[in-house]
A protein has these predicted regions:
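N-terminal secretory signal peptides
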Residues: 1-26, 34-42, 46-49
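Pepsin/retropepsin-fold aspartyl endopeptidases
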Residues: 33-34, 38, 43, 52-55, ...
Length: 452
């Protein structure tokens, strides 16, 4: 999920899921995130925005032309090895595709140019935690001003996200308003967890955390719509979903100021950090979650199954540590970068900025405004009905969507990916399909019907 596209925020999603604010930094720091806020990253020596061979590397990046942007940044660095923006952005291009040596090389180059640059430090910290190099991430989180994250990841001993088991097929207990599956926490009885790729870490209710014997290694007080909420972060020994068990897992939970649970719709939420350690199929049509150890053999089977189903691989990009992106189209836009949000809740199949809806001539019902929240601030969206929205060969026609006139097309770091967004796809779109996220080969597969 991209930061401006969270449609409905409940206190449960905000605090327990650690994602309702659209960007986890605001919750961990307890800072209010204002829609459209932008941080201007410093450029070494006041260098201008990256230009190469008459083409604008930054414009290529914003447009989602990442390979071309990467080459353009490299050309800049050949001429000017001290260009911080080019080094950092070239590292970011590598990070989007989980090309870790590439990302580390250029982000380390940027770090040497400007050791105190918060954006560089945050990107490099993200690069390390994706590889489970938690200890290396700690000084980078500190330099990025993320003291809570620094304390959290410094608390780990041994290998995080240890995988036991090879495959699990976990049936959904319900589809709506959000999917629920059963999971065991520290060997305890089954608990009801939802899942959402718009959320980062595994999180759970304070009651479940207490039952599991968790203790906090970091905490933060925040104010959500006038309600004081305490966020806690710790280390979970065991999280089991069917035949797959994860050990030594980062986990968060929350309480009201009086110590009570924040919402009771479920017992917790599984975020993208868990899923990028596995090869996961979200089998909407079959109402099940298929989790696999990410081996070459498992990936080969997924590719073969997708080929038989006629599903071509789509690119997968991961921005801001947990926001999944791929390519899709809306109302004849042509192939563009879109957000892909699996799980969660909501009635709209996609959400898009108002400027995009007008640009594409999408029928919008301005007589029926929807008053909701974004970044914990009031906003108003409107129903809209694009003639077609598409992810690969997965298509929905005249389906209910929403548009937000206040949403910006591009939100820079730290509150956005810096990528021009056309739309984000949500829970209702996926219902006729099964969708697989392969974070090793960085592909998305979406096929009609139940997974085989």
């Amino acid at each position: 999920m991209v930061p401006w596209l969270r449609k409905v925020i409940t206190k449960r999603e905000k605090a327990v899921a650690d994602e309702g604010q659209w960007d986890r930094r605001s919750l961990l720091r307890g800072a209010a995130v204002v829609a459209g806020a932008a941080a201007a990253a410093p450029l070494l020596g006041g260098a201008a925005r990256a230009q190469a061979g008459g083409g604008d590397a930054d414009a290529l990046f914003k447009a989602g032309k990442f390979e071309q942007a990467g080459r353009a940044y490299e050309e800049i660095l050949k001429k000017d090895p001290t260009n911080l923006n080019a080094a950092r952005q070239r590292g970011y291009v590598g990070l989007l595709s989980n090309k870790f040596p590439d990302a580390e090389k250029h982000l380390t180059m940027a770090l040497k140019l400007a050791p105190d640059d918060k954006e560089t430090n945050a990107l490099l910290a993200d690069c390390y935690i994706r590889q489970d190099k938690f200890s290396l991430s700690v000084p980078r989180w500190q330099a990025a001003g993320e003291d809570g994250y620094a304390k959290w990841f410094a608390a780990f001993r041994g290998e995080p996200y240890q995988i036991h088991g090879d495959i699990a097929r976990v049936p959904w207990q319900q589809m709506d308003p959000s999917p629920l599956v059963e999971a065991s926490v520290n060997g305890g009885p089954p608990k009801r967890f939802t899942f959402y790729t718009g959320a980062p870490n595994l999180s759970m209710s304070a009651t479940v955390a207490k039952e599991a014997g968790l203790h906090a290694v970091a905490s933060q007080k925040t104010d959500f719509e006038g309600t004081i909420i305490w966020m806690y972060y710790g280390v979970l020994d065991s999280f089991k979903l069917g035949g797959i068990e994860l050990r030594n897992v980062p986990v968060g939970w929350s309480t009201t100021e009086s110590g009570g649970d924040v919402g009771t719709d479920n017992d917790g939420l599984i975020g993208t950090w868990v899923f990028y350690h596995l090869l996961t199929t979200f089998d909407y049509a079959g109402r099940s979650l298929i989790l696999r150890r990410p081996t070459p053999e498992a990936a080969s089977k997924v590719r073969a199954d997708a080929k038989r189903a006629g599903a071509k691989p789509l690119p997968l990009w991961l921005a801001l540590d947990h926001y999944v992106h791929s390519t899709g189209s809306i109302a004849g836009s042509g192939t563009q970068v879109v957000g892909v949000n699996v799980g969660g809740t909501g009635e709209s199949a996609a959400v898009m900025p108002g400027e995009r809806a007008k640009q594409l001539g999408i029928r919008t019902d301005y007589d029926r405004p929807l008053e909701t929240f974004g970044h914990s601030h009031a906003t108003t969206t409107y129903p809209c009905y694009p003639k077609e929205i598409r992810l690969g060969d997965a298509v929905a026609k005249e389906i209910y969507c929403e548009t937000d006139p206040n949403a910006r097309i591009n939100v820079p770091w730290p509150y956005g990916s810096g990528i021009d967004m056309w739309a984000a796809f949500f829970h209702p779109f996926h219902k006729p399909y099964n969708i697989t996220l392969d974070f090793t080969n960085m592909n998305v597969y979406i096929a009609r019907g139940k997974a085989t």
